[in-house]
Regions:
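Subtilisin-like serine protease catalytic core
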Residues: 1-83, 100, 170-173, 182-185, ...
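Short acidic, glycine-rich surface-loop motifs adjacent to enzyme active sites
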Residues: 67-69, 89-117, 140-141, 249-253, ...
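Extracellular S/T/G-rich loop segment that most often corresponds to the catalytic His/Ser-adjacent loop
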Residues: 3-22, 147-238, 251, 278-363
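Structural recognition of the beta-strand scaffold that forms the well-ordered cores
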Residues: 45, 56-57, 63-68, 103-108, ...
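Catalytic cores of secreted or luminal carbohydrate-active enzymes
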Residues: 104-105, 122-153, 402-406
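Edge beta-strands of jelly-roll/beta-sandwich modules across compartments, strongly enriched
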Residues: 255-267
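Hydrolase catalytic cores
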Residues: 44-47, 52, 65-72, 93-101, ...
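Hydrophobic, small-residue-rich alpha-helical packing segments that form membrane-like cores
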Residues: 40, 73, 81-98, 104-110, ...
């Protein structure tokens, strides 16, 4: 479709490869791309896997468009850029239009790289496709609820220092500091070795013990906020970042019109469990792009405990919108395993495809069977949230369960 890379395999190609009965030969015909984690396999099986005596997907007769995302750099398999995810969404949407079929786009992915207010290019793109074709975008809320990766502070108060711990064996720690452009103050990074570095502007500090780089990002056409992104890497003589207590210090230099500062560390998939803020803010921990507008953001319910999972990302967004909007079972979910068999998966990544499956069934009833050909997008979100069941002990609507459980 004009992307300049990749290959397309239809159902006949995939079935022919499976019919060989030889895994090595079948992967020569259709390369496997899910990696050893089996994340994509599990997600797809929960949403639309075939039914059998042990398990099965929700919308088990649905067609599946599986998009393997491009990886960039890195000897460990690299990483996926948000632009690659946007191209994957574009491909799926174009294919649905070509086939004249409604589509549920499931995104079991999340990042902390953004202000969490719906205004990144990534979030705006996902919001904008709501008006294209008969679709709904379902997004996992992320597993950052108890991760200690977010803190909110007010520089106009007496609290002007925020401490965070860096655990052992970290190779690179990135810290995202979002402030209002209208506020005037300087930002300092204090290291365990006693250095105090002004990171208010672009700066690079290299030594035997630590390498620090800060980048100041001014307001853009997409956001009026200001970002200071800090990268902490090992010193020239070390393999890992110095572990210990680091801190961010704020020094007011002029007018403070708001004073609120939000800071995020990377998600739990990127850093160790020992790394985090000492006094974290568990709210506003829903990951991007679940913070986009006009998407169905999904939290995880712990069916064993009878309550929302402690790891499930919490709202509100940084600009005060309710997220997540809905919840589904997200602990020990049965899913297809990579290479065969069944596995148990935990996380909002595996709650979201349950909602995607339910959405597909409702869209079939409405659009395919012509009971309501407008049953997609915001209308579908409205109906699903209306008939969700409130969780006992949770605020309704609330920043943990949204409008309730399906």
């Amino acid at each position: 479709m004009g992307y300049g890379y990749g290959a397309q395999y239809d159902s006949s190609d995939i079935n022919s490869a499976l019919d060989t009965g030889n895994r090595g030969f079948s992967e020569m015909l259709v390369p496997a791309s899910d990696g050893l984690s089996g994340h994509g396999t599990a997600v797809a099986s929960i949403a639309a896997g075939s039914r059998n005596s042990q398990s099965g997907g929700i919308a088990y007769e649905s067609e599946i468009i599986a998009v393997a995302l491009k990886r960039t750099g890195g000897s460990d398999g690299g990483y996926t850029r948000t632009i690659d995810i946007m191209e994957g969404i574009d491909y799926a949407l174009r294919k649905a239009i070509e086939l004249n079929m409604p589509i549920v786009i499931n995104l079991s992915f999340g990042t902390n790289e953004g202000a969490h207010d719906g205004n990144t290019l990534f979030e705006n793109y996902i919001t904008d496709i709501n008006g294209i074709w008969k679709n709904i975008v379902v997004v996992a809320a992320g597993n950052e609820g108890d991760s200690r990766h977010h803190v909110r502070t007010d520089v106009s108060s007496n609290i002007n220092r925020t401490e965070f711990a860096i655990g052992d064996n970290e190779k690179n720690i990135r810290l995202f500091i979002w402030k209002y452009f209208q506020d005037e103050f300087e930002i300092y990074l204090n290291t365990p070795s006693g250095k105090r570095i002004n990171i208010s502007n672009d700066v690079t500090v290299s030594s035997q013990r630590e390498n620090i780089e800060s980048v100041l990002v001014m307001p853009t056409p997409y956001t009026s906020k200001q970002l200071v992104e800090v990268s902490i890497r090992p010193g020239n003589s070390l393999d890992y970042v110095i572990s210990g207590i680091w801190s961010i210090e704020f020094a007011v230099t002029g007018t403070i019109k708001c004073g609120i500062v939000d800071m995020w560390l990377p998600t739990i998939e990127a850093i160790g469990l020992s790394t985090g803020f000492l006094r974290p803010s568990p709210d506003t921990t829903v990951t991007i792009p679940a913070t986009a507008r006009k998407v169905l953001s999904v939290g995880a319910f712990n069916q064993d405990a009878g309550s929302m999972a402690t790891f499930s990302g919490r709202g509100y967004t940084a600009d005060g919108r309710l997220v997540p909007l809905i919840a589904a079972y997200g602990v020990d979910v049965t899913a297809a395993g990579y290479g065969g068999g069944y596995v148990r998966k935990t996380g909002t990544s595996f709650a979201a495809p349950k909602i995607s499956g339910y959405a597909a069934c409702i869209m079939e009833w409405g659009i395919v069977r012509r009971n309501d050909e407008n049953m997609y997008g915001e209308k579908l979100i409205a109906y699903m949230t209306r008939y969700a069941v409130g969780i006992e002990g949770e605020e309704m609507p609330g920043i943990r369960q949204g409008w309730g459980l399906i």
